[in-house]
Each structure stands twice: as structure tokens, then as C-alpha cells.
């Protein structure tokens, strides 16, 4: 089964690598050097030459630069585009068939993974280029609330609505001058959104 890439941009945030790609027997026949490199990485014996054989989309060379393999399980580490993929990206760190580079090996061997990283199981397909919203997605694994906040960052109108709602809630929670809490109810949403039209 061929895995069709959705993007060929280097450092994009890639898909979840649920497409397994060519079978192991097919890989052994068509790309014996690459399969040997993957086997060596299983025992932490990969070399710089193996890194070149596997390659990546960014390297524009090697097994993982080819459309047929780029989004397959074998390339889930080198093409993930996810920060600390070997530490926090399950399709990479939980997949015995994903090639881990010498750099990945050194980070894991020397226990250099940042503490507190969430293991991302549910990453969906999305694009990005390493900006702060991508960083937020990577570390928070695309949960519903975080996806909403990321989308807000990319839409000024939604950002304005979110700021206004937060300010209204803070204002209502502040104690009144008499030391009592303001028990007024929040204005109905229709009133809030009608006031936005005045901006």
C-alpha cells in the first residue's frame, strides 16, 4: 500500500503515520540497505551512513524522501516534523519499525528528553512551519480545547471574541466596592455578540 504525502514541505507538521506503507517483505526486496539500517537502529547500532540511507524529506535523499515511504511507519521519526519526536510522538517512539537516527539514539541513551512531555497518541493531520501554534499543538496533542485555542490564534475576530468573554468573566468575578461579590448574571450571549458589531 502506497502512502500519499499531503505535503512535501520540509518541517511541516506531518500526519499520524497510520498508513503502514509497503510491507516489510516488500521493503526487504526493494530496499535491502534501508531495511538493514532499520534493523541496526532496533539495537542502537545505527551509523551516520544509515542516517543517509534512510534520509528524510528535508534531506531530499534516502528512503524517507520517496513518496512511497515518506508517510509510512518506517519514516515516522525522521519525517514527523514534531519536536522531540523520539520522546513525545508515539508513532515514532512506540513503533519498532520506525528508523531512529543516531541523534535520536543519543538523546534517548543520554536521557535528554525534557521532563513533563505528553506522549502524543492522537495527532491529526495539520500543517505548520514551527511557529508558536505548532509548538502548542505538539506538546498538547491536539486535544479539543487546545485545537480551539490554536485556531483562535490564527483568526483575529475569534481572538477578539475570546478576549471580550474573558474580560466579562473577570469583571463579574471581581468583588464590588462594598466587599460583596457582584451577583448580577452575565449578559445573554446575544447581547455580547450584538455589541461586537459596534467595533
From Swiss-Prot:
Essential for viral fusion with host endosomal membrane and core release. Not required for virus morphogenesis and egress. Induces complete autophagy through the interaction with and down-regulation of host PYCR2. Belongs to the asfivirus E199L family. Interacts with host PYCR2; this interaction results in autophagy activation. The keyword Cytoplasm does not apply. GO terms for cellular component: host cell membrane; membrane; virion membrane. It is found in: Virion membrane; Host membrane. Disulfide bonds: none annotated. One of its GO terms (biological process) is symbiont-mediated activation of host autophagy. Contains intramolecular disulfide bonds. This is Inner membrane protein E199L. Keywords: Activation of host autophagy by virus, Disulfide bond, Host membrane, Host-virus interaction, Late protein, Membrane, Transmembrane, Transmembrane helix, Virion. Induction: Expressed in the late phase of the viral replicative cycle. The chain crosses the membrane at residues 150-170. The keyword Phosphoprotein does not apply. It is a single-pass membrane protein. It comes from the Viruses.
Amino acid at each position: 500500500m502506497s502512502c500519499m504525502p499531503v505535503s512535501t514541505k520540509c518541517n511541516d507538521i506531518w500526519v499520524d503515520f497510520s498508513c503502514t506503507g509497503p510491507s516489510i517483505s516488500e521493503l526487504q526486496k526493494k530496499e535491502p540497505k534501508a531495511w538493514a539500517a532499520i534493523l541496526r537502529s532496533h539495537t542502537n547500532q545505527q551509523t551516520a551512513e544509515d542516517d543517509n540511507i534512510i534520509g528524510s524529506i528535508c534531506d531530499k535523499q534516502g528512503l524517507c524522501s520517496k513518496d512511497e515511504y515518506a508517510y509510512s511507519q518506517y519514516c515516522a521519526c525522521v519525517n514527523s516534523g514534531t519536536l522531540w519526536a523520539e520522546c513525545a510522538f508515539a508513532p515514532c517512539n512506540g513503533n519498532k519499525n520506525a528508523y531512529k537516527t543516531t541523534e535520536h539514539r543519543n538523546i534517548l541513551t543520554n536521557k535528554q528528553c525534557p521532563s513533563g512531555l505528553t506522549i502524543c497518541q492522537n495527532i491529526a493531520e495539520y500543517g505548520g512551519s514551527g511557529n508558536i501554534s505548532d509548538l502548542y499543538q505538539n506538546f498538547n496533542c491536539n486535544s479539543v480545547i487546545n485545537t480551539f485555542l490554536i485556531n483562535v490564534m490564527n483568526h483575529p475576530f475569534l481572538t477578539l471574541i475570546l478576549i471580550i468573554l474573558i474580560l466579562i468573566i473577570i469583571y463579574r468575578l471581581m468583588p464590588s466596592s462594598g466587599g460583596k461579590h457582584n451577583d448580577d448574571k452575565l449578559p445573554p450571549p446575544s447581547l455580547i455578540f450584538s455589541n461586537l458589531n459596534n467595533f
